[in-house]
A protein has these predicted regions:
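Short glycine-biased active-site loop of nucleotidyltransferases that positions the nucleotide triphosphate
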Residues: 87-90
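Short solvent-exposed loop/turn micro-motifs enriched in small/polar/acidic residues
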Residues: 60-61
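Basic/polar, cationic surfaces and motifs that engage anionic cell-wall
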Residues: 1-34, 38, 42, 71-75, ...
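Short Gly/aromatic-enriched secondary-structure transition segments
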Residues: 47-55
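A short acidic/small-residue loop/turn micro-motif
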Residues: 83-84
Length: 163
């Protein structure tokens, strides 16, 4: 199977890995930088505390993303870089998860709501991550096979940030 032009193991083999909050094998195991949205309306705030509460309610021990970027561009880190996340099963052992606040318009429909501050912060973060993990592909959650029919991150991550 190919993702972003990269050959990966079968989805069945990826699913066999347990996502348990342990560390990944090495920096070389990072193959994807996955952009997510919080799937919240652009006119409503979604704090780190709300995100944490919602992720714990889903059975995660904490926030599943490595990074969360608020509408004002404030970024918080919630997992160590080589810690297995909980954001894109079955790809958690080979990816870094980045979530931006938003993704829905005022009516609750999928929409690219990335603010200029978020765009700048995401670009800065991805530039650093690409230096650390040069082989990693920048993709949206919806671009990973087996995760459809998701619309997340409600934009074309590869087109916006993959250059």
């Amino acid at each position: 199977m190919n993702i972003g032009g990269e050959k990966v193991r079968s989805e069945r083999l990826l699913l066999a890995n347990v996502e348990d909050g342990k560390n990944m094998m090495s920096a070389d195991s990072i193959r994807f930088l996955v952009l997510h949205c919080s799937a919240t309306r652009r006119n409503q705030d979604y704090s780190v505390e709300q995100l944490r509460r919602d992720h714990k309610a889903r059975g995660f021990y904490d926030i599943g993303y490595h990074f969360y970027i608020r509408k004002d561009g404030t970024m918080t880190q919630h997992r160590k870089l080589l810690e297995v996340g909980a954001h894109a099963r079955p790809y958690n052992r080979c990816s870094i998860g980045i979530c931006y606040e938003g993704g829905l318009n005022e009516e609750g429909r999928a929409c690219n709501t990335i603010t200029p501050q978020q765009f700048e912060r995401i670009q800065e973060l991805l530039a650093v991550l690409k230096k650390l993990f040069p082989k990693a592909k920048i993709l949206g959650h919806r671009d990973l096979p087996g995760t459809t029919p998701k619309e997340c991150p409600c934009c074309n991550a590869s087109e916006l940030f993959g250059k």
